[in-house]
Structures are given as structure tokens and as C-alpha cells.
Amino acid sequence: EGCVFRQMTSGASGGIWVRNWTDRVESRNIRFQNCEFYKSGADELLAVWGWSGAVRDVVLSGCSFYETQTQEALDADHCPVWFITLGQSGTTDVRMEDCTVRAEYCETIFRMVGDKNRAVVDNCDITMKQPDSMAKHDMKKGANPMLARGNDRADGSTVIQNSRITLSGDNGRRICYQLSALKGNTLDVSLGYGIASTKEVSGNTIRGRIRHKVFQDCSGVENNNVEVRRFSILG
């Protein structure tokens, strides 16, 4: 509680990992409260996942997460693919609430994959503004979500809700991909594509500029307030 974590090596790997090395016992009741996390370099800032076993009842509450890339990291192209992992392999049960996230150079803020994953992001303030100097993305070479990639399940296991989200990226970027649910959020966006392959999209306010479809291959799209202009981003 109240700790500050700085990983400023600008290296190719390393971060804070909450995981279990064995399936013989479970790890439970892990809390980070009112902490600050700073990261320069590749790999995640924070990763929570069961790995060889299970981690349950993990809570991140009132914390702040900052991507603070040094010039050394940028010159070496040491930027994270995933900024925060909330589930990957093994069994994961994690909740992130009342947190602040600020990112720039990472490919995707949240990785929330795995059939045995339950991850909820609730009431958070999330901002990612891709710098003009960052290499442009090609939708033919990947989904390129800025906010999150989920586990493609319709059981409510990977959810982002009740949050304030600001995203700015190039014409090959989309908001999110394969979440169980995106609901009750306010999104201010400027990017190429919207929400894709998400099982429930409800009660969101979506404002800004999107070049292509706002919703693509989504089910359960209802009660959203969409105020979006279509445009073409240079580059």
C-alpha cells in the first residue's frame, strides 16, 4: 500500500509479475492499493496471470500506471507490446478499480486473454495518445487494438466498464478486440477503427473521429450514444 515502483532500465525485458509457479497450490488475496508504477523499456509494466497454476482475488485499487519511455528505450525500440497483462495462461482472477493509466508507445494497454481468465477493469481513467513519431499500423497485419484484447468469450470474463477512456492513434488502430464486454464507458477517440468482435457493447458514449466502422462483428450492441465523425488520418 502506498508504494512507488520504478522500472527505468529501458531494457528489452523485465517488469512486475504476479504469477504462480506451480499447480499444487493457489495464490490468493493479493492487493496493490494506492501505488504508483513507472516503466521505461519493453515488456509489461505489470503482469498478473496464473502461468503454471492459479492466482485469485487479485485487486489493483487506486493505483496509477505511467509509461515513461527514455530516449535510450526509444532508440533501441524497447517499447511494450502489452502495457498491463490481466490474464494470459493458467487461471487468473483479477480486478482493477479506481486506477489511472497513462501510456504512449505501447501497442495495447490491456492483455486480457486465456480461457480461464476473469479480469474486470472498473471506474478507471485511461489515456493513450500515440506520438506522431511512432510507426504506423497496418490492419492487414493484425487487429492492432489500443485499449484491450480480450479472451473472445461471451461469459463476462473480460470486461472494461464505467471508465473514462481517451485514445488517439493512426489509421491502422482500433479501439478494442474480442472483449467479453465494453459497457458504461465514456470514450473520446481519434483513430482508424472502432470496436471489433466484442460480445457486449452497451451503455457507452463514444465521441470523436473514426475512419471506418464504429462496430464490427460485435453482438449485443445496445443503448450506446455515438457522436463520431469519419475522417482520414494522414500516414
Regions from the PLM with identified roles:
Residues 11, 23-26, 53-55, 71-75, ...:
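Short, solvent-exposed loop/turn segments that connect beta-strands within catalytic domains
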Residues 9-16, 37-48, 68-81, 89, ...:
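Short glycine/acidic-rich loop motifs that flank beta-strands on beta-rich extracellular proteins
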